[in-house]
C-alpha cells in the first residue's frame, strides 16, 4: 500500500525549509542548493498504523523534507529490523549525495567543497556529528545498488561497521523487452548513424 503523509502545503513547507536553511548557511548562495540535503525537517512516520504493523522497515531515498535525522532516530529506536537501500552517497557522507573527489567522509566531513565558504565547523561538520550519533550502535542493514557504492559505504566512518550487501537495480524483461536496435531506430524515426543516450 502507498500512504500519503502530510498535505500539499506541509510537504512544500518542509522541502522549502530545508532548502532555506542550506541557502542561509551558504550565505545566500544557490551554489549546490539541490546537491546537498541536511535532513533538518521531515515527517514522523512512526505514529502511522502502517509503521506500527510493519515487521521490518525498509528505507530508500528519504531527503528533501521527507524524513529528518530526528525522525530517522525515532525509526531506529522502534526496535524493528531496518534495511536502508542506498541510491546515492548521502547515508555515508554528511550532506552530499555524491562526494565527487572529496573523501572527507572516510574520516570526518568538514571544509565541505559543496559549500560556498567551507570551514572546520561548517554545516557539513554539524550534520556529520548528528549522523555519527544517529548511526552509533544501531544494527541496520545497508543495501547498495552497486559494488562501487558499497565500496564507498565500507570506507565511510559513519556506516563502515554496518552489514552492507549489494543488490543491483534490475529490470524485468517481462515488462521491458529488448528490440533490434536498427529496427527500433526506424520505427521511432531516429537517426541511424548518431550515438543516442536515452534516460527516464
Q: How does the language model describe each region?
A:
Residues 1-56:
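A conserved catalytic-core segment of Leloir-type glycosyltransferases
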Residues 91, 104-181, 187-190:
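Donor nucleotide-sugar binding/catalytic pocket of nucleotide-sugar-dependent glycosyltransferases
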Residues 143, 191-200:
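Conserved donor-binding/catalytic core segment of Leloir-type glycosyltransferases
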Residues 46-66, 81-87:
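Short N-terminal targeting/anchoring amphipathic segment
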Residues 56, 81, 140, 194-195:
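Alpha/beta-hydrolase fold active-site loops
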Residues 1-4, 52, 77-81, 162:
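N-terminal subdomain of nucleotide-sugar transferases
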Residues 2-9, 15-16, 71, 94-99, ...:
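Short aromatic-enriched loop/helix-cap "lid" or pocket-rim segments at secondary-structure transitions
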Residues 70-79, 130-134:
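Catalytic-core regions built around general acid/base machinery
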Amino acid at each position: 500500500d502507498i500512504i500519503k503523509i502530510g498535505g500539499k502545503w506541509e510537504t512544500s513547507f518542509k522541502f522549502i525549509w530545508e532548502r532555506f536553511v542550506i541557502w542561509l548557511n551558504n550565505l545566500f548562495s544557490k551554489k549546490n542548493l539541490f546537491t546537498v540535503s541536511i535532513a533538518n525537517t521531515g515527517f514522523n512516520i512512526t505514529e502511522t498504523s502502517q509503521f506500527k504493523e510493519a515487521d521490518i522497515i525498509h528505507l530508500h531515498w528519504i531527503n528533501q523534507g521527507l524524513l529528518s535525522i530526528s525522525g530517522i532516530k525515532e525509526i531506529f529506536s522502534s526496535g524493528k529490523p531496518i534495511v536502508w537501500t542506498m541510491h546515492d552517497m548521502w547515508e555515508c557522507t554528511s550532506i552530499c549525495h555524491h562526494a565527487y573527489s572529496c573523501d572527507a567522509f572516510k574520516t570526518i566531513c568538514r571544509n565541505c567543497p559543496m559549500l560556498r565558504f567551507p570551514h572546520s565547523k561548517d554545516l557539513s561538520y554539524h550534520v556529520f556529528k548528528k549522523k555519527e550519533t544517529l548511526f552509533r550502535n544501531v544494527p541496520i542493514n545497508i543495501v547498495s545498488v552497486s559494488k562501487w557504492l558499497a565500496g564507498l559505504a565500507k570506507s565511510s566512518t559513519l556506516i563502515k561497521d554496518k552489514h552492507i550487501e549489494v543488490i543491483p537495480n534490475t529490470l524485468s524483461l517481462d515488462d521491458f523487452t529488448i528490440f533490434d536496435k536498427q529496427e527500433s531506430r526506424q520505427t521511432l524515426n531516429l537517426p541511424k548513424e548518431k550515438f543516442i543516450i536515452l534516460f527516464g
